[in-house]
Amino acid sequence: MTRSPGLMVPLLGLSLGLALSLPEAVTDDCGSLGRVEHLAFARVPRTRELAPLVRASGPLNSLYGTVRRFLSVVQLNPFPAELIKTLLNDPSSVKTDEVVRYEAGYVVCAVIAGLYLLLVPITGLCFCCCRCRQRCGGRVKTEHKAMACERGTLMIFLLLTTLVLLIGMVCAFATNQHTHSQTGPSVKAVPETLLSLRGLVSDVPEELRAIAEQFSVPQKQVSKELDGVGENLGNVIHNRLKSTVYPVLASVHSLGQALQVSIDHLRALNTTSVELQEAQRHLEPPVQAHRERLLALLQDSWCHEENCKRVLSQAGALQLGADFSQTPPVDDVLHRLKDVPETNFSSMVQEEKATFNNLPLLVQVQAVSVVKDVKKALAEQPEGLRMLAQAFPGSEAASRWSQALEGLEQRSRPYLQEVQQYETYRWILGCVLCSAILLVVICNLLGLSLGIWGLFAREDPSHSETKGEAGARLLMAGVAFSFLFAVPLILLVFVTFLVGGNVQTLVCRSWESGELYEFADTPGNLPPSMNLSYLLGLKKNISIVQAYRQCKAGAVLWKVLQLNDSYDLDKHLDIKQYTHKIQQELQSFQVDLKELDLLSPTARQDLEALQRSGLEKIHYRGFLVQIQKPVVNTDMWQLAQELEGLAQAQNDSLLRQQLREEARELRSLYQEKVVPQESLVTKLNFSVKTLESLAPSLQVNTSDFLDSVTRLKGELPVQINHILRNATECFLTREMGYFSQYVTWVRAEVTQRIATCQPFSTALDNGHVILCDMMADPWNAFWFCLGWCTFFLIPSIIFAVKTSKYFRPIRKRLSSTSSEETQLFHIPRVTSLKL
């Protein structure tokens, strides 16, 4: 089946235009290999984890702040470095006046407590003796005008004082219980902290080994992705080359079709020309015979009409028009294209396309040996990681560190047990004394309630005086309890104040300001047995303050402790040599695509034969000259019709019969000879025009295409290697990213968790939280609230004694106003006494 030249040329030109140039090499998009996975590493469990303690906020924080401000007023002196130095190094040479000078605020408070301890019991004894003789604390003798105002004022002051006592008692109860509940965990936290610090250095090698073992995580991930690297690289090459290969194969297919069309038309041209020449040899004698007979018949004397002369003219022109023996020969071209095409271009293109589409599988098969070598190199462990734990220089420092902390732990246990024991005694005594204050508060409140009830009941003449008397007795009972518990209260307050206040002002305040660290760093301040820098194994050029700050910032152990400075974490984490070996193995991979030929040898021979055939040199105009001529110069069908008309006009039957016979034979000759030749001429015309339009461009395109394919086959391996190299670099970058994730994770784990000295600073911070926040703050708040209640017992005693007088019944009544009125009227009558 032939094709229209108008459709073939644009298709061929487009396909060739796409195939003539190879795309420039560009760097492949690494995203085509897929998303980089985020590796999940198991958190290395620490044998002893030291969690930082944080002071929890609560409703008592404002009270703690008030106590601290009070203590800052009591103790205005700075940290006594010289006094503490003397006390630690030569206790016998400590001067009392220096201690008193530093503790001046506490001495003043001690004087106040002493006065309280002396005066309150004496006052209580005197009041007791006075009450026994019924000379004080009695009742109101007479009623007067200002009595109600005095009584109301005293009751209000007593109520306010009682409320203050109640608030202080509640706070004392709360802080007492909070102190006791915090002491147990605080005492327990001290050995736990020391135990955790003992493993600060000794546990590092074991944890480093656990870190090194997790190198298998990136190894497994890389090994998993290596299984599909061949197919992935093949897909990358396929995607990059398909914009080149597919147009080339389309051009091959189009050229094959054009070649087939050209040969088909060339063969048709040759066959048709031969057939036309043969047909003309058979057509010429009958045409010539008809011409001669018609001329002889029509040139007779009877043919004198106009119609006859016209027919005579047509008969005279009855001869062959085209001479196909004059057409150019095409035998040489046909000879050159003999047996062309030998290749089935459609099948060849499908095979090449299938080969190209199987490129990922082909690359995967070729990559098997390379992947095996890469996995072999991958299975090894870098030298630095193998020595990560063994090279850690912590054995000597760990021994010294552990011995120091173990000794400190052993020495601290008896003291901690005593602290817990004495705290229990303090808690019991605190509960008893808080209960005593509660008893005073209850007596005051009940006394006030009954006393006020009794006052209202006096308006009734039939009232009983028992309510007021009971209220007064309850108030006096509260006074008795106040005198009774004043001594243990002031003693407990002063002892706890002296201990807790000095802990806060001497230790906690200097700890927060850093003066305590500076004191420990100053040479000579501590005795040789308490050389903390030596015991802790700190570097000689690093002070405790510097060690604390560096550890707080996350410094590693070998930067602070006396370890071997040759330990270099970055050197152990340098896996460049390991990854370089993997890169070399993978970069040595080359793809062999000999099976991808694009143009088979036989197809090339067909196209080269077409190129050498001289198809474009055929003189197609020579064919068109003969084609444009008619087969017979006269229209034989019209001539036959003219003869029929002329025959009908004749009277001579013989002449009429002859004309009709000629007309019939002309029609028969036309149908049998001329019409088939005209069909052959039409066929020849189509082939000639197709070849004339197709041959020049086909020759040029074939030549260009062969040059392009030759160049492409030379450049394609280079292009493939370039694409493969870029894709391999992308893959290696991706895989090296997994090792980078591991190195980053190891560096963070080692410097921030495993080999960091941060637990040292955390232990110091925890010590401050334990001593100052968990113990000292509630302890100081307890004595503050208890002291508050203790000193408010004095106004409570005074107001209770004063108020109780007004609750007892009045035995005598003296009213100046009523007496005067009685004297004016001179009416003798019995007056009732208001009790």
UniProtKB/Swiss-Prot annotation:
State the annotated membrane topology for this chain.
Multi-pass membrane protein
Q: Which UniProt keywords apply?
A: Cell membrane, Cell projection, Cilium, Coiled coil, Glycoprotein, Membrane, Phosphoprotein, Signal, Transmembrane, Transmembrane helix
Q: Which residues are glycosylated?
A: 270
Instruction: Kindly list the positions at which Phosphoserine occurs in this protein.
Output: 819
* Main subcellular location of this protein, as a coarse class: membrane
An example of a Pfam family matching this protein is Prominin
Molecular function terms from GO: cholesterol binding
**Which compartments is it annotated to reside in?**
Apical cell membrane; Basolateral cell membrane; Cell projection, Microvillus membrane; Cell projection, Cilium membrane
Does the record's keyword annotation contain tRNA processing? no
Q: Which InterPro entries match?
A: Prominin
Provide the free-text tissue specificity comment from this protein's UniProt record: Expressed in kidney and testis. Present in urine within small membrane particles (at protein level). In the submandibular gland, expressed in seromucous acini. In the parotid gland, expressed in the serous acini and in all segments of the duct system. In the sublingual gland, expressed in large excretory ducts, but absent in intercalated ducts. In the extraorbital lacrimal gland, expressed in the serous acini. In the eyelid, expressed in the acini of the meibomian gland.
Q: Coiled coil where?
A: 646-675
> How is the protein modified post-translationally, according to the record?
Glycosylated.
Q: What is its quaternary makeup?
A: Binds cholesterol.
Stated family: Belongs to the prominin family.
The entry's protein name is Prominin-2
